[in-house]
């Protein structure tokens, strides 16, 4: 199983960051790689089990399912159902933690998935830098870093 871990400190209060990412359908509002997104079947975007269907800026479509959402812990876990990436059994978690020294937020985005040995390094780079770090960097820019 391949594991990816990316973290960052966002110079914004945790409630503000959580408000930006909480909706499972908000990805297109803050992630630069996402062209458009919708929740299938017009389900609520915070309903565990709902499916996010989005198109990438560079082409390609991804479908993801919300597995867990906690306002108390400020954490969201989801899986990929369909992706152009050569991965299987993908589960990711985006977690926020209040930084007590200042009005900041620690964000960590992790994933575990299976892929072939030959794709492992590329998928770690794609998910870690292309998805997670670019998303966290965009949040930092949007929220004032």
Whereabouts are the PLM-identified features?
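Hydrophobic-ligand binding "helix-grip"
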Residues: 28-29, 55-104, 112-115, 142
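Juxtamembrane/interface motifs at transmembrane-helix termini
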Residues: 36-40, 84, 97-98, 125-129
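Hydrophobic ligand-binding cavity/cleft-lining segments
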Residues: 1-44
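A structural signal for short, well-ordered beta-strand segments
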Residues: 6-10, 94, 109-111
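Short, solvent-exposed linear patches
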Residues: 47-48
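A conserved amphipathic terminal alpha-helix motif
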Residues: 106, 112-145
């Amino acid at each position: 199983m391949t594991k990816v871990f990316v973290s960052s400190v966002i110079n914004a209060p945790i409630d503000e960051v959580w408000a930006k990412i909480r909706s499972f359908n908000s990805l297109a509002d803050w992630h630069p790689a996402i062209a458009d997104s919708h929740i299938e079947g017009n389900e609520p975007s915070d309903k565990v089990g709902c499916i996010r269907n989005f198109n990438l800026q560079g082409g390609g479509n991804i479908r993801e399912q919300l597995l867990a959402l906690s306002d108390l812990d400020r954490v969201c876990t989801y899986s990929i159902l369909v992706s152009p990436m050569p991965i299987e059994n993908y589960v990711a978690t985006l977690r926020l933690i209040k930084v007590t020294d200042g009005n900041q937020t620690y964000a960590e985005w992790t994933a575990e998935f299976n892929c072939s040995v030959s794709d492992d390094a590329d998928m770690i780079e794609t998910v870690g830098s292309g998805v997670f770090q670019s998303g966290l960097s965009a949040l930092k820019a949007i929220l004032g870093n």
